[in-house]
C-alpha cells in the first residue's frame, strides 16, 4: 500500500500539471476511504506465537483506525484547499491518538499558511 501522504502528493502533482480531474480523484479517494472506515471495529487476528507482544502492547486498534481515518480526511481536504476542514480532522486525530505524528506535522503545515 502507498503511504497516504504519497496519494496527497500525487494529487498535488496532477493539480500542478493542470490535470484537475486526476488530482481531485486522489483527494476524494483519501476522504472517501476515511469516511467509509471511520466507524470500523478493528479486531486483530493473531497466531499464538504473537500473543506475548499483544499482551505487552495493549493498543485500542479501533481508536487508532478512527484517528487514521481522520488523518486521511485531513489530507484529502488539504488537496481540495479546505484547510480549515483539514485542521479540524487533524485535531480530531490528535485527540484520539496524541502520538499521531503525521497529523501533528500536517496540522502545523496548515496552521503555518
PLM regions: where:
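Residue-level recognition of tetratricopeptide repeat
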Residues: 3, 20, 37, 66, ...
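Alpha-helical junction/boundary sensor with strong preference for TPR arrays
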Residues: 34-41, 97
Amino acid at each position: 500500500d502507498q503511504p497516504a501522504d504519497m496519494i496527497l502528493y500525487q494529487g498535488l502533482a496532477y493539480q500542478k500539471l493542470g490535470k484537475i480531474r486526476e488530482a481531485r480523484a486522489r483527494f476524494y479517494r483519501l476522504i472517501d476511504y476515511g469516511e467509509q472506515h471511520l466507524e470500523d471495529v478493528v479486531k486483530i487476528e493473531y497466531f499464538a506465537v504473537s500473543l506475548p507482544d499483544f499482551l505487552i502492547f495493549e493498543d485500542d486498534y479501533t481508536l487508532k483506525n478512527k484517528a487514521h481515518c481522520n488523518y486521511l480526511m485531513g489530507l484529502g481536504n488539504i488537496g481540495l484547499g479546505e484547510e480549515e476542514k483539514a485542521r479540524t480532522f487533524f485535531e480530531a486525530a490528535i485527540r484520539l491518538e496524541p502520538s499521531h505524528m503525521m497529523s501533528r506535522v500536517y496540522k502545523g503545515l496548515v496552521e503555518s499558511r
